[in-house]
């Protein structure tokens, strides 16, 4: 009844994807068909990424990856795409101090290739070359988020 390492009833950490889904998908091509004509310069592309996680029940969590992409030629919007892509994850056996990194680094890392492909397909289907979003460093995003929350907490802790 004891494992070889001597731990009793130790549960090895597990991370399972129970479901993946598109929560919201929007593609706007306001200048079509003129926006589809060739242009001298490559458009300026701006991409914003956000990750949220919420408990569902027990060890199940809903992790949502939001990607917003906008292409501009000067001040004219060529296209705007928004994808809210979610996954339901069952997470068990991780120490409590590892839960936030699992939710905000590992889960979005698993969702990202699917979300990236959806954005590439929708931009291609909108008449543009597929937008292949560069890999995202979710670890760096998480570290930045933690630093911002700590700075915010320090500001709130300072008496007026």
UniProtKB/Swiss-Prot annotation:
It is found in: Cytoplasm. Homotetramer, a dimer of dimers. One homotetramer interacts with 1 SecA dimer. Belongs to the SecB family. It comes from Agrobacterium fabrum (strain C58 / ATCC 33970). PANTHER family: PROTEIN-EXPORT PROTEIN SECB, PTHR36918. HAMAP family: SecB (MF_00821). Keywords: Chaperone, Cytoplasm, Protein transport, Translocation, Transport. One of the proteins required for the normal export of preproteins out of the cell cytoplasm. It is a molecular chaperone that binds to a subset of precursor proteins, maintaining them in a translocation-competent state. It also specifically binds to its receptor SecA. InterPro entries: SecB (IPR003708), SecB-like_sf (IPR035958). It holds the Pfam family SecB. One of its GO terms (cellular component) is cytoplasm. This is Protein-export protein SecB. One of its GO terms (biological process) is protein tetramerization. Gene3D superfamilies: SecB-like (3.10.420.10). One of its GO terms (molecular function) is unfolded protein binding.
């Amino acid at each position: 009844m004891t494992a070889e390492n001597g731990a009793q009833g130790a549960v090895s950490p597990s991370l399972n994807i129970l479901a993946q889904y598109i929560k919201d998908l929007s593609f706007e091509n306001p200048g079509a068909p003129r926006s589809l004509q060739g242009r001298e310069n490559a458009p300026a592309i701006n991409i914003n990424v956000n990750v949220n996680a919420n408990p569902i029940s027990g060890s199940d969590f809903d992790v949502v990856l939001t990607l917003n992409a906008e292409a501009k030629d000067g001040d004219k919007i060529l296209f705007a795409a928004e994808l809210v892509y979610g996954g339901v994850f069952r997470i068990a056996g991780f120490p409590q101090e590892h839960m936030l990194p699992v939710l905000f680094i590992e889960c979005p890392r698993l969702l990202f290739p699917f979300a990236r492909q959806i954005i590439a397909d929708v931009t291609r289907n909108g008449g543009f070359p597929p937008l292949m979003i560069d890999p995202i460093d979710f670890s760096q995003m998480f570290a930045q988020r933690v630093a911002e929350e700590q700075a915010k907490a320090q500001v709130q802790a300072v008496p007026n």
